[in-house]
Amino acid sequence: MKFIDEATIIVAAGDGGNGCISFRREKYIPFGPAEGGDGGNGGNVWLQADENLNTLIDYHFQHNFHAENGKHGQGKNFTGKCGKDLTIKVPIGTRVVDQNTNEILGDLIVHQQYLLVAKGGLRGLGNNHFKSSANCTPRKKTNGTKGEIRRLQLELILLADVGLLGLPNVGKSTLIRAVSAAKPKVANYPFTTLVPNLGVVQVHKKQSFIIADIPGLIKGAADGAGLGIRFLKHLERCRILLHLIDLAPADQSSPVENASIIINELKRYSEKLATKPSWLVFNKLDLIDKREALNIAQTISDALNQKHNYYLISAMNHQGIKTLCRDIMLFINKNK
């Protein structure tokens, strides 16, 4: 199924039913008291997180949603039936924004979590509500109020513990294939990854973490170049970022300059994202002498003022991966 992580929908809660003007009329009571019933409340609109969904594609085809209106009141003090609530299911990780005010209404991050997005209108009152000892036959009632109408921006932000960052073709997809059961496309050309991929890394029997791979970033990504900038939001909820660096770029580019590109683009996109815990992971150790790899890694680590230890791995040969995954698990457990 196509991965769609943004959608716009219009939700309308139900209107409240009107109150009724009615009087008791029986054979021997020609001018009885008021007995007009109240209307029913309008139905609310809710969003509900569903772990069985992973895309917002359905809402690219259906944009308008309306809860049921409340029924009008009737004679003999019959209250109108309340309108049924409408529940719209969305993937876990969906952020809901009111497009008119840019207010974030909520984040749905737990299975079956509910969020009220449009409140139904209140019921109108029948004339029975307005009778008194001085006036038992009032000709007064109120109409139900209108239900809320909202234009909502739905943004799916993946829930992952670890996010992979890097230029195109540095081996992010190869790494996620090596450490999990995920099977993203892998090929020797840029932008093989077109959408984010998630993988579950099982470190021990009862310990695992989720890792996210997004399309590679390029210089100018913060200005819209390439594919990765659109998907950077999926790293917002990650606890730690792994910055993958190619030790032996096929285009003979400088690993130091390549590392700086990612750091700069991340800062330009979001200072908050740029300050997340980030580890340097140097990939393709199988293509270069280990001593040379250590020199490159140390140079880049010093240039970027990296405080945490860096890692040398070969995603292709699974070299150094076990240690990396173990340390990630320790970090996650420590920072819960």
From Swiss-Prot:
Q: Which cofactor does it need?
A: Mg(2+)
EC? 3.6.5.-
Instruction: Give the Pfam families listed for this entry.
Output: GTP1_OBG, MMR_HSR1
**Recorded GO MF terms:** GTP binding; GTPase activity; magnesium ion binding
Using the record's annotation, list all stretches that form the Obg domain.
1-159
InterPro entries linked: G_OBG (IPR031167), GTP-bd (IPR006073), GTP-bd_Obg/CgtA (IPR014100), GTP1-OBG_CS (IPR006074), GTP1_OBG_dom (IPR006169), GTP1_OBG_dom_sf (IPR036726), OBG_GTPase (IPR045086), P-loop_NTPase (IPR027417)
Please state every residue range assigned to the domain named OBG-type G: 160-333
Q: Quick one: which residues bind Mg(2+)?
A: S173, T193
Q: Does the keyword Acetylation apply?
A: no
**Sorted UniProt keywords:** Cytoplasm, GTP-binding, Hydrolase, Magnesium, Metal-binding, Nucleotide-binding
Domain of life from the UniProt record: Bacteria
Subcellular location per the Swiss-Prot or TrEMBL entry: Cytoplasm
Magnesium among keywords: yes
* Any Gene Ontology biological process: ribosome biogenesis
A cellular component annotation (GO) from this entry: cytoplasm
Q: Which SUPFAM superfamilies match?
A: Obg GTP-binding protein N-terminal domain, P-loop containing nucleoside triphosphate hydrolases
NCBIfam families from the entry?
Answer: Obg_CgtA (TIGR02729), PRK12297.1 (NF008955), PRK12299.1 (NF008956), small_GTP (TIGR00231)
What does the record give as the function of this protein?
A: An essential GTPase which binds GTP, GDP and possibly (p)ppGpp with moderate affinity, with high nucleotide exchange rates and a fairly low GTP hydrolysis rate. Plays a role in control of the cell cycle, stress response, ribosome biogenesis and in those bacteria that undergo differentiation, in morphogenesis control.
| UniProt similarity note | Belongs to the TRAFAC class OBG-HflX-like GTPase superfamily. OBG GTPase family.
Assembly description: Monomer.
| Name of the molecule in the record | GTPase Obg
Native source organism of the sequence: Baumannia cicadellinicola subsp. Homalodisca coagulata
**Name of the gene encoding the protein in the UniProt record:** obg
